[in-house]
Curated annotation (Swiss-Prot):
Pfam family membership, one: UPF0122
Gene3D superfamilies: Winged helix-like DNA-binding domain superfamily/Winged helix DNA-binding domain
Protein name, UniProt field: UPF0122 protein SGO_1122
InterPro entries per record: RNA_pol_sigma_r3/r4-like, UPF0122, UPF0122_fam_protein, WH-like_DNA-bd_sf
Signal peptide per UniProt: none
Summary of the function given for this chain in its UniProt record: Might take part in the signal recognition particle (SRP) pathway. This is inferred from the conservation of its genetic proximity to ftsY/ffh. May be a regulatory protein.
Source superkingdom: Bacteria
Family per record: Belongs to the UPF0122 family.
Length: 110
C-alpha cells in the first residue's frame, strides 16, 4: 500500500505541482520523490516534524481534490491504455502507429 501511495502522490505531483505553493512543492517532493523523513525535512526548513506532517497531509488532500475535479491523471492512464490496445491490435498500420506515437509524445512532454 505504501509504495502504491508513493507512486500515486508522485504522479499527482507531476500533473498538479504548478498549482501548489513553493513550500507544498518542496515538502512533497522531498518526502515522496527524494524519500526524506519528516525529521530531515523539518531540519532543512527549521520547523517542527508536526508542521511538516500537517503540511504534507494537507497537500496530499489538495492533490487528490485537484484530481477529483480535473481528472488529468486518470484520463492520462485511460488514454495510455487505449493507445496501447490500438497499437497492439493494428501493428502493421504505419499511419496509425505514427499517430499513436504523436499522441504519446504529447502526453509525455514536459
Amino acid at each position: 500500500m505504501e509504495i502504491e501511495k508513493t507512486n500515486r502522490m508522485n504522479a499527482l505531483f507531476e500533473f498538479y505541482a504548478a498549482l501548489l505553493t513553493d513550500k507544498q512543492m518542496n515538502y512533497i517532493e522531498l518526502y515522496y520523490a527524494d524519500d526524506y523523513s519528516l525529521a530531515e525535512i523539518a531540519e532543512e526548513f527549521g520547523v517542527s516534524r508536526q508542521a511538516v506532517y500537517d503540511n504534507i497531509k494537507r497537500t496530499e488532500k489538495i492533490l487528490e481534490d485537484y484530481e477529483m475535479k480535473l481528472h488529468m491523471y486518470s484520463d492520462y492512464i485511460v488514454r495510455s491504455q487505449i493507445l496501447e490496445e490500438i497499437a497492439e491490435k493494428y501493428p502493421k498500420d504505419s499511419f496509425l502507429q505514427e499517430q499513436i506515437a504523436t499522441l504519446s509524445s504529447i502526453d509525455n512532454r514536459d
